[in-house]
Regions:
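Alpha-solenoid helical repeat scaffolds
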Residues: 1-183
Length: 183
């Protein structure tokens, strides 16, 4: 497979998407069978996924690249990969938005973190009920107490107190105890 990709590049055309996917799977299989070391396999997969996100920018490749970075303990690269997927509007799950927001907070980017959460709250997806077939349009990031607290914290850290207060008030109304009112 590596030879086919190399020959395609030498001849001046872009190798097929499936070739890269197959090559990444081969490295994963060789790693699992302990034929090659995990570090080498992960390095090879990173190179392949970096090509895939550039030539064929699909969500699955961004997530696979990010996951590989995580396995290599390259958290900054993982965050940047998630951010790139976000910038391309490829994220469509609450956990993806919240993971990116939390990583941005860890890297002291609270304003961006808040923007990511708000974007997730504003993004609408259609959910289909398997039993009834009814469709419902919902926000990707739900307005739950925990999420609202995270958003309020991000706004506060970004010195956007006027944006944090209404969010905290909403979270406090959802709270089962009075702790949120103290914040």
């Amino acid at each position: 497979m590596e030879e086919a990709i190399r020959l395609a590049e030498v001849e001046g055309y872009r190798p097929k998407e499936g070739w890269y996917v197959l090559l990444a799977a081969c490295f994963s299989e060789l790693k699992d069978r302990k034929i090659i070391g995990p570090e080498y396999a992960l390095e090879q997969q990173v190179g392949i996924y970096e090509i895939l996100v550039n030539y064929y920018p699909k969500k699955q490749y961004f997530l696979q690249l990010g996951g590989t970075y995580q396995q290599m303990d390259r958290q900054d690269d993982y965050m940047l990969t998630l951010k790139a997927a976000y910038d391309k509007d490829l994220l469509n799950k609450e956990g993806e938005y919240l993971a990116l927001a939390q990583m941005l907070l860890l890297k002291k980017n609270p304003y961006w973190a808040a923007q990511v959460i708000v974007a997730g709250q504003e993004k609408q997806i259609t959910i289909k009920d398997e039993k009834t077939g009814d469709e419902e349009v919902v926000s990707v990031v739900k307005e739950k107490e925990k999420t609202l607290k995270l958003l309020a914290d991000a706004w506060r850290m970004a010195q956007e107190i006027d944006k944090a207060i209404p969010v905290l008030e909403k979270a406090a109304k959802m709270s089962k105890d009075g702790d949120t009112y103290i914040l």
